[in-house]
Amino acid sequence: MKLSARIAAPAAALVLAGLTATACAPGTSDTGAEGDAKTGTLRVWLFQEVGNKPKEKVVDAAVADFEKAHEGAEVEVEYIPVDTRAQRVKAAFNDPKSAPDLIEYGNTDTAGYVKDGGLADVSEEFAAWDEAKDTDPTAKQSVTVDGQVYGAPLFVGVRALYYRTDVFEDLGIEPPKSQDELISTAKKIRREKPDLYGLAVGGAYTYGAMPFIWAQGGELADETGVTYRSAINSAKARKGIEAYTSLFGDDNCPAAKCAAMGGNATVTAFASGKAAMAIGGDFSHAAVEAGAVKGRYAVVPLPGVTAGSIAPAFAGGNNIGVLKSSSHRTLAVDLMKSLTGKETQAKMFDAMGFLPTYTDVLGTAAEKEPFVGPFVETLGAGAKFVPASPAWGQIDASLVLPTMFQEIASGRKDVDAASDDAAKKMDAAFAEAG
């Protein structure tokens, strides 16, 4: 294996919520490939992580096995910053000669990259791949657009409820078992311990708010056959919005401080001992372990509306896809399988803590590391995904939902007005995307 000399500098940690920034990128051209060479150099772009060495070791092992099994093939890996990936990928779609053969991409980018014509349809190969039959359905959904498969899932990430065991023990309370109980527990803690946020929430924490909407039976958007129509202002969605925004106030998390917070800020508040609860991902575990609350917290699934139920979580994560422009399609698909197969995902979990996308490998991971249990349980209860539309990148990048939450939290608009405005913006994006 050859490691590219253009190793990217470390970037900010990847947020599994899917960071999309495709709106201002240039248009794409025809990216169809010519030929299918069975030897030569395959180029791969993977994301640079904070603390990337463990990931590199896992990738190196997978590549070595691939090269051993494919005489005459070499692999060159380049690690690129997450925050500039949109520009790099768009440029690659426009210039096939300089493009890699495979890329790692966030699962909320799938539909946009498919619309741009950059990703190869690997439906046939995926269906014939024996390991793929054990792929978690939600993970498979993240590589599927209009029934066709455009890559293989690499890892999945979901969120659950982190809580301070010492605070709960001191107050004689149990972890909340319903959404109403979550809200009342948060406010009780704030009342009894005013130096703490009961539940750290953020107006810019889109993927922490979504479970409240989904738990009430609401949806972000409804598929209408050829496109989507916003459902964020439906009666059920508004119940979820109202529940989430009720947590912004002096009786839990003051809007003046919390309205601007995103997911990282809420987890940081918890890890530093400023909050009794937070909605964090399996990928937040290392940060919490490194914080002031180490040894004084536990994790349970975020409760749903009915006591004992689990609120649907957003299934974030990353995939590996073959570019349509690759002149080594057969080799590239085989390398995709090597980089996302069960053996590699098991090693990646051990090295990086990324949750495997295979149900059997995920079960083994949960047995090995108990902290994974609540996240596996959350996945098993039925995680959800964003609309499979290229418009989602624009909706996410233009902060449509954070603006809605912040307007409500600040008192500038009520739930009805703010959700109506958000729905109009979403529908405009869906219409533009076609």
Features from the language model and the residues they span:
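Extracytoplasmic/periplasmic substrate-recognition and gating elements
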Residues: 68, 171, 246-252, 289-354
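Glycine-centered hinge/linker elements that transmit conformational signals in sensory
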Residues: 186, 229-257
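Conserved C-terminal helix/tail region of periplasmic/extracytoplasmic solute-binding proteins
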Residues: 169-170, 381-434
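Hinge/lid segment of periplasmic solute-binding proteins
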Residues: 107-158, 212, 298, 367-370, ...
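Long, aromatic- and glycine/proline-rich binding clefts that accommodate carbohydrate-like moieties
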Residues: 300, 350-397, 407, 431
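Short, solvent-exposed loop/beta-turn-alpha elements that line the ligand-binding surface or hinge
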Residues: 123-135, 199, 218-239, 289-292, ...
